[in-house]
Amino acid sequence: MIRVAINGYGRIGRSILRALYESGKRQQIQIVAINELAKPEAIIHLTQYDTTHGRFQPRVKLVDGQMQIGDDTIKIFHEPDPAKLPWRELDIDIVYEATGAILDRQSCEAHIHAGAKQVLISHPSSADVDGTIVYGVNHDLLRAEHTVVSNASCTTNCIVPVIDVLDKHFGVKSGAITTIHSAMNDQQVIDAYHDDLRRTRAAGQSIIPVDTKLARGIERILPHMKDKFEAISVRVPTINVTAIDLSVTLDKTVDIATVNQVLELAANGRFNGILGYTDEPLVSCDFNHDPRSSIVDGTQTRVSAGQLVKLLLWCDNEWGFANRMLDTSLAMIAAKQS
């Protein structure tokens, strides 16, 4: 049984906990502790009730300052300094670092000094970590000595499996990406101050361009794609599910049917459970609570002049990513035991 702690219990932290119980992985992973500065009553309430993902079916209670889910008791801490957390006493194997603020090796090593054996960051990190993993593509690179690992981003997890499939079958020369991302909690409900002037504006009233490092994230997973991709991102007034408009120029000449067939076969084969394929006339809310990293919308595939291919990909940017956090942590332990 893997003993884990969650540091930072926001959208991703809570999704990880709920995904653990819904995915059937509870027999492999035990959440021992949560560190979150919010009040315990709010922690319990937002675990039980969620606007995006609905009510959590197991009853969640606050008992003597701890979270209780069925027979499971999870300790709650409110410690701002990770180095002071009792990970050694709790025998923590992996910390899910989900604050969104601790992104480099030195900061993550506070968890190691506190007694945790490994750290998995739920965010793109600095380059000094032991590895950045997109599960299904490069998790085989994990090694026993790796202590600090990044799970990349939700959009990197969405797009990299597709690029990998296209490159292996047809060769990818270059690409351009537009991420159409649901609003996030770094935006404003009504106009308010922010360092990014576009993010001073009300999230529910505008399509808002934001900076993205997605192209660099692709390079970290697929180094041979260096300088081949560029990306832009806009935030839209929905609370969950993201679409990615991917355009790639291929080495080989293809048609729509060939591209879709290759992607559908990959979804049913090597990337089963990670990549999906649909030819139904669906909209973004149909992918809410989908545990896969990416779903190809085959109805939107286009080919121009035989080599320029445009794809539409969907992902639940919370739920899919939370499920990959679980998968990557299991892969980290497997590598450590090999």
Curated annotation (Swiss-Prot):
Pathway: Cofactor biosynthesis; pyridoxine 5'-phosphate biosynthesis; pyridoxine 5'-phosphate from D-erythrose 4-phosphate: step 1/5. It comes from the Bacteria. Coiled coil: none annotated. The keyword NAD applies. The active site is at 154 (nucleophile). Homotetramer. This is D-erythrose-4-phosphate dehydrogenase. It catalyses: D-erythrose 4-phosphate + NAD(+) + H2O = 4-phospho-D-erythronate + NADH + 2 H(+). Keywords: Cytoplasm, NAD, Oxidoreductase, Pyridoxine biosynthesis. SUPFAM superfamilies: Glyceraldehyde-3-phosphate dehydrogenase-like, C-terminal domain, NAD(P)-binding Rossmann-fold domains. The lineage of its organism: Bacteria, Pseudomonadati, Pseudomonadota, Gammaproteobacteria, Alteromonadales. PROSITE patterns: GAPDH. Substrate binds at residues 153-155, 199, 212-213, 235. Its main location: cytoplasm. Catalyzes the NAD-dependent conversion of D-erythrose 4-phosphate to 4-phosphoerythronate. One of its GO terms (molecular function) is NAD binding. It is found in: Cytoplasm. It holds the Pfam family Gp_dh_N. GO terms for cellular component: cytosol. It comes from Shewanella oneidensis (strain ATCC 700550 / JCM 31522 / CIP 106686 / LMG 19005 / NCIMB 14063 / MR-1). InterPro entries: E4P_DH_bac, GlycerAld/Erythrose_P_DH, GlycerAld_3-P_DH_AS, GlycerAld_3-P_DH_cat, GlycerAld_3-P_DH_NAD(P)-bd, NAD(P)-bd_dom_sf. NAD(+) binds at residues 11-12, 317.
